[in-house]
């Protein structure tokens, strides 16, 4: 779980224990199926974004919150602040992390989604996914990314059920990042009228 202030189920990472608990059989080759989006892994978009954030910050998994802070109605004081807490840490060797990040950068600079990201003011690391559901329906389209590449501050995750290829979501992710970085720093300039939380 991510710690977000909503009802949330734990994600499922496919593996021998889970497969056998569901009455299935885990084979040595099953790990290859998991690596390409098959088998029984199940994660929410917020869990995927949390995973990407953990990966690119070097292995510290922090709680997710909807709000940064709550201010009094006259904006004179901060009533409550939400600080993320460390939920867990994972060990990632620098060379492995850099290899993963380099692969994610290559997707946006030389890969199937480069046309969407070439005009952004920052470099982006991303990964597409097409999680198979059944032979009768389109795969679930999955797209995760982080930016800026050298000093990450935002992670996105998108899932469209039966959306086909994850690369189809690249344009949407690029639009979100374009807006995010074009408005960066302007939040302090928003007038107080009609603004409840900042």
State the predicted function of each range:
Residues 1-158, 196-198:
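Beta-lactam-recognizing serine transpeptidase/beta-lactamase-like catalytic domain environment
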Residues 39-46, 163-171:
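Short, conserved micro-motifs enriched in small and acidic residues
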Residues 119, 126, 159, 167-198:
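Periplasmic/cell-envelope proteins involved in peptidoglycan metabolism and beta-lactam response
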């Amino acid at each position: 779980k991510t710690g977000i202030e909503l009802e949330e189920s734990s994600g499922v990472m496919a593996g021998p224990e889970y497969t056998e608990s569901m009455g299935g059989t885990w084979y040595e080759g099953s790990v290859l199926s998991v690596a390409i989006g098959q088998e029984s892994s199940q994660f929410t978009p917020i869990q995927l974004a949390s995973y990407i954030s953990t990966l690119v910050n070097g292995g510290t998994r922090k709680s997710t919150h909807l709000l940064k802070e709550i201010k009094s109605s006259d904006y004179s004081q901060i009533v409550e602040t939400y600080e993320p807490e460390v939920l867990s840490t994972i060990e990632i060797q620098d060379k492995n992390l850099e290899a993963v990040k380099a692969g994610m950068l290559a997707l946006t600079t030389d890969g199937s989604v480069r046309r969407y990201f070439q005009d952004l003011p920052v470099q982006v690391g991303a990964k597409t996914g097409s999680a198979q559901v059944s032979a009768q329906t389109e795969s679930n389209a999955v797209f995760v990314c982080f930016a800026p590449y050298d000093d990450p501050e935002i992670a996105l995750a998108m899932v469209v059920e039966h959306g086909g290829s994850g690369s189809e979501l690249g344009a949407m992710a690029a639009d979100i990042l374009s807006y995010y970085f074009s408005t960066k720093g302007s939040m302090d300039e928003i007038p107080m009228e009609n603004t409840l939380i900042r």
